[in-house]
From Swiss-Prot:
One GO term (biological process): one-carbon metabolic process
Domain of life: Bacteria
Family: Belongs to the AdoMet synthase family.
Name of the protein described by the UniProt record: S-adenosylmethionine synthase
Cofactor comment: Binds 2 divalent ions per subunit.
UniProt source species: Salmonella heidelberg (strain SL476)
Length: 384
């Protein structure tokens, strides 16, 4: 491959869509804590002065949705009306129903191993050896920039920052290898009383420089810091937010394909979420094993059926063993039936709120990021 540019973006925990994702996953976690077998599909909508939590939930648990919502918004940092959104005074509306019994009869089984998929669909997982976390560099560094924005906002280093922010990083590649960063965009909500010059200098020194490796920056790297010149009105006052609207930010930043299903607010019986996590786990272990430099996995399901309807392995010509052998290894070492992957990745725990900002992949504390099968795969493939 010749020289090319590739761009990925991320958004902060205070972005309206991410507020919605975090509320949905906070509700899910609270329910799973009491009832690991709950069926949860929780959607959230946020706008100036209000939060609407809706969806289908079947559970023996009781949770205080209003309290969970306010606590989540408070932790993000919207605690005063001058930010356009206030955890203490916003209205919280609830519109929760039960999961359809027509779905239940296809999912629930006497033998757990025969648990059917909660819906049809296709899911992708991806890994690449271009970063230490086996993720694409553009999305990895886009996430780290907005994570740093939240860090210096919350620890008081830059107290005039506000919760809403977006980042975008364009990497230069030559023959598939990173040779530099071409452009960086960082837009952050701020208080009224900070001037543009001071903001740009502080963002460069406290957010961008500590995060982006200096060897990838050069005199031709372009920086766009709050390029409109003003970003006081942000969060739900600037835009409404909705669960599941940042699916590329949540995954691979456009470097890999996406099946279209969002993650947040869904319990692990929903293969949109759990099978996408499992596909990442498979791809990451293949790359960690040295069986390919890049790997994309596709799995698909039929509602009510346990076995995947298809498994695909794509290695973009970087495989060290035949792709046909990789597919056999995947089938041998990974149980991709809904119940099997839930057990394999230990998913029936309240671990989801943390996934809802800064990406679901490339963060080592999540079980689907383990590389515990890499050596097994390498040995089975006959590589020394």
């Amino acid at each position: 491959m010749a020289k090319h540019l590739f761009t990925s973006e991320s958004v902060s925990e205070g972005h309206p869509d991410k507020i919605a994702d975090q509320i949905s996953d906070a509700v899910l976690d609270a329910i799973l804590q009491q009832d690991p077998k709950a069926r949860v599909a929780c959607e959230t909508y946020v706008k100036t002065g209000m939060v609407l939590v809706g969806g289908e939930i079947t559970t023996s648990a009781w949770v205080d949705i209003e309290e969970i919502t306010r606590n989540t918004v408070r932790e993000i940092g919207y605690v005063h009306s001058d930010m356009g959104f206030d955890a203490n005074s916003c209205a919280v509306l609830s519109a929760i129903g039960k999961q359809s019994p027509d779905i239940n009869q296809g999912v629930d089984r006497a033998d757990p191993l025969e648990q059917g998929a909660g819906d049809q669909g296709l899911m992708f997982g991806y890994a690449t050896n271009e970063t230490d976390v086996l993720m694409p560099a553009p999305i990895t560094y886009a996430h780290r920039l907005v994570q740093r924005q939240a860090e210096v906002r919350k620890n008081g280093t830059l107290p005039w920052l506000r919760p809403d922010a977006k980042s975008q990083v364009t990497f230069q590649y030559d023959d598939g290898k990173i040779v530099g960063i071409d452009a960086v965009v960082l837009s952050t909500q701020h208080a009224e009383d900070i001037d543009q010059k001071s903001l740009q200098e502080a963002v460069m020194e406290e957010i961008i420089k500590p995060i982006l490796p200096s060897e990838w920056l050069n005199t031709s790297t372009k920086f766009f810091i709050n390029p409109t010149g003003r970003f006081v009105i942000g969060g739900p006052m600037g835009d409404c937010g909705l669960t599941g609207r940042k699916i590329i930010v949540d995954t691979y930043g456009g470097m890999a394909r996406h099946g279209g299903g969002a993650f947040s607010g869904k319990d692990p019986s929903k293969v949109d979420r759990s099978a996408a996590y499992a596909a990442r786990y498979v791809a990451k272990n293949i790359v960690a094993a040295g069986l390919a430099d890049r790997c994309e996995i596709q799995v698909s399901y039929a509602i009510g059926v346990a076995e995947p309807t298809s498994i695909m392995v794509e290695t973009f010509g970087t495989e060290k063993v035949p792709v046909e052998q990789l597919i056999l290894l995947v089938r041998e070492f990974f149980d991709l039936r809904p119940y099997g992957l839930i057990q394999m990745l230990d998913l029936l725990h309240p671990i989801y709120k943390e996934t809802a900002a800064y990406g679901h992949f490339g963060r080592e504390n999540f079980p689907w990021e383990k590389t515990d099968k890499a050596q097994l795969l390498r040995d089975a493939a006959g590589l020394k």
